[in-house]
Amino acid sequence: MNYIGSKLKLSNWLETEISNVAGHSLSDKVFCDLFAGTGIVGRKFKTNVKQVIANDMEYYSYVLNRNYIGNCQSILKAGELLQRLEQLPPREGLIYQHYCLGSGSERQYFSDENGKKIDAVRIQIEEWKNTRYIDEDTYYFLLATLLEGADKVANTASVYGAFLKNLKKSALKPLSLEPALFEIGSDGHQVYQADANQLIKNISGDILYLDPPYNARQYGANYHLLNSIALYDDFTPKGKTGLREYSRSKYCSKSDVVPVFEALIRDADFQYIFLSYNNEGLMSVGQVREIFERFGKYDLVQTEYRRFKADKTENRNHKANSTFEYLHILEKTF
């Protein structure tokens, strides 16, 4: 999934730097990914640690992490179920009605054919769940598979803040349900959909990885359509882009981010805390260092990487094609 702030290309670097600090044998450690997004970092550590705790306030993220982190055993008849979903006749449901041109919505997030296919698949998954034909693990596996497939054929410039006037090449391809595969192993991992500053008061562990929003862009707005597919609830889309109501993170606010971040660190019951942030974030390196040094031993490592695709396609007028990713490190002592 093409995702703002995705750590896919940085995951090996992150694993190395975290292991250099917390130890290379992590089998007895509890690892928490508090702003999990698509779960890339938690997935990297899933088979190497005792337990992963994954959290994000967005429901689409919960669905993805409930599958990639929460699921640990093979899904029975996964191939058969996906084949049946692929063969469903199209249905004119919520996605077609609100986000496809053919419905008269004046929005074009998907081709008419893909919108109807998404509806058919989403409705069937819910029916299987409600009739107990599938269990909870299978439900989230199928939902995650649908979200991944829908994202690949979305007619957007990487995020869902707006749709493109004409269907791009990838949006013309038919929806395909490629299984959202996850690592098999021991269970006991935990997945939450909660406010990070509230959840941190009720969990504890060894390694806390933080990847909060860097800037003013709200994930609930940028990925509203993934929430709509995941929730598939009755709502009224607003405006030209069809936004739904969404939660706003204080980590996207210049005036709020420092106090909420300091409160988070204060309440964290973890020995090692790692913060991913970049050189264009709302908090400066100095501000983060000042907060971390109040609670223990501080260090900083960094690496250069290429800018997220949407930054280059949405007329953001950035001067540089790359940014610096900072990994702030705290060994908490008080």
Swiss-Prot record:
Any single GO BP term: DNA restriction-modification system
Reaction catalysis annotation: a 2'-deoxyadenosine in DNA + S-adenosyl-L-methionine = an N(6)-methyl-2'-deoxyadenosine in DNA + S-adenosyl-L-homocysteine + H(+)
Transmembrane segments: none
Pfam assignment, any one: MethyltransfD12
GO function terms (MF aspect): DNA binding; site-specific DNA-methyltransferase (adenine-specific) activity
The keyword Transport belongs to this UniProt entry's keyword annotation: no
Keywords noted in UniProt: DNA-binding, Methyltransferase, Restriction system, S-adenosyl-L-methionine, Transferase
InterPro entries referenced in this protein's UniProt entry, alphabetically: DNA_methylase_N6_adenine_CS, MeTrfase_D12, SAM-dependent_MTases_sf
Family of the protein in this entry: Belongs to the N(4)/N(6)-methyltransferase family.
Name assigned to this protein: Type II methyltransferase M.NlaIII
Organism listed in the record: Neisseria lactamica
Gene name tied to this protein: nlaIIIM
